[in-house]
Structure formats: structure tokens, C-alpha cells
């Protein structure tokens, strides 16, 4: 199933953090924080201004982004977990993957 975000929404695949600390201690699932980094899989058509002009989104498919801790809506499709967030909840682009 294809997910196409609408307007200024962005579809992300959350990236899990390391399972171990640098010193080798394994972090149990109960102590893990919610991911705040993800890969952009799809973007909406952009934000519409009051005068009807459409402003394209700044992020692109393939960008690795950092987003607000409690941002977006989690969705599960075909056993995979995704996050749909508004572009304003994305704090920074930290890389790009193809």
C-alpha cells in the first residue's frame, strides 16, 4: 500500500537508536527513548498560503531528519511502522540517503 501525505505533511520511517551504549551496555526496550530521527519517504504537495499560493516543502525524499519528540501520528501498514508529521515539527535535516 502506498501512503501519500497531504498538504504540508511528511511520511517518515523512524530510525531506531543504538541497542548498546558506547561502553557496551545493552539498553532494554523499557529504557529506550522514542526515536527522534527518521528518513523522509514521501512529502505532501506543500503548504497553501491565505492567498492560495502553494509553498513547496523544504525537505525531500531521502533526507534524514530530526523531529520533535511527540510529533506526528504513528501508522502501521503491512507490519511496518511509519510516522506522519507536519513539516513544522521537523527541526533539522542531518543527512541524505538515496
Curated annotation (Swiss-Prot):
One of the GO biological process terms: chaperone cofactor-dependent protein refolding
Which InterPro entries does UniProt cross-reference here? Chaperonin_GroES, Chaperonin_GroES_sf, Chaprnonin_Cpn10_CS, GroES-like_sf
GO cellular component terms, A-Z: cytoplasm
Q: What's the main place this protein lives? A: cytoplasm
User: Which Pfam families is this protein grouped with?
Assistant: Cpn10
Q: What does this protein do?
A: Together with the chaperonin GroEL, plays an essential role in assisting protein folding. The GroEL-GroES system forms a nano-cage that allows encapsulation of the non-native substrate proteins and provides a physical environment optimized to promote and accelerate protein folding. GroES binds to the apical surface of the GroEL ring, thereby capping the opening of the GroEL channel.
**HAMAP family for this protein:** CH10 (MF_00580)
Recorded protein name is: Co-chaperonin GroES
**The species this protein was found in:** Coprothermobacter proteolyticus (strain ATCC 35245 / DSM 5265 / OCM 4 / BT)
Question: Source organism lineage?
Answer: Bacteria, Pseudomonadati, Coprothermobacterota, Coprothermobacteria, Coprothermobacterales
From the UniProt record, report the name of the gene that encodes this protein: groES
Amino acid at each position: 500500500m502506498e501512503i501519500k501525505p497531504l498538504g504540508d505533511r511528511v511520511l517518515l520511517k523512524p530510525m531506531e537508536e543504538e541497542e548498546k551504549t558506547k561502553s557496551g551496555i545493552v539498553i532494554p526496550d523499557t529504557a529506550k527513548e522514542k526515536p527522534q530521527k527518521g528518513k523522509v519517504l514521501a512529502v505532501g504537495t506543500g503548504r497553501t498560503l491565505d492567498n492560495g499560493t502553494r509553498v513547496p516543502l523544504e525537505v525531500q525524499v531521502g533526507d534524514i531528519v530530526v523531529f520533535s519528540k511527540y510529533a506526528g501520528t504513528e501508522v502501521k501498514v503491512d507490519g511496518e511502522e511509519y510516522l506522519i508529521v507536519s513539516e513544522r515539527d521537523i527541526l533539522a535535516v542531518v543527512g541524505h540517503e538515496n
